[in-house]
Amino acid sequence: LKISEDPIPTFRKLMKEYSSGYYKVPSVGAGTANTEFESITGMSLHYFGPGEYPYKSILKETTCESAPYVLKNLGYTAHAVHNNEANFYGRRSIFPNLGFDTFTSAEYMEKEEDKNPLGWTKDEVLTDEIIKCLDSTEGSDYIYTISTQGHGAYPEEELIDDPEITVTGAASEAQNNQWEYYCN
């Protein structure tokens, strides 16, 4: 695969200047809620039943130790921001059980109608929402932000006119288009 330029130069710069590492997630391609659960709680899904989604089971009924609860004990206000619908994976009712004080979903975002070619709300709306969270409190804030713009499936047809980053060398032109869409 040949990519015309590094698609993540800012991340590479940050990786060189600060501590960094690899992050292993429990699912790829679906199951975002399980990755969120592990990130927010530090608990592995290996302690749950096969195919279980804590968001769809235990978290509907009870709270759970989590980063938001720990940080709230240190004086932080905990916010969750997600540019998708609040009821998807039951986040509207789950996030309070994970210790979040506020939850802003796509329905409450001013630019919610700004979509990418696949229909996902663009990530640029998240910046304004994060700033609103920061401005809403006097003290320190923990803001957990979930993006949807990069969700696949990635298009096999060319959707970007004059892409900044070009990709060649995949097994097919359709795969080149998918990689190019992802990189841009």
Predicted regions located by residue number:
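Solvent-exposed soluble domains appended to multi-pass membrane proteins
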Residues: 1-184
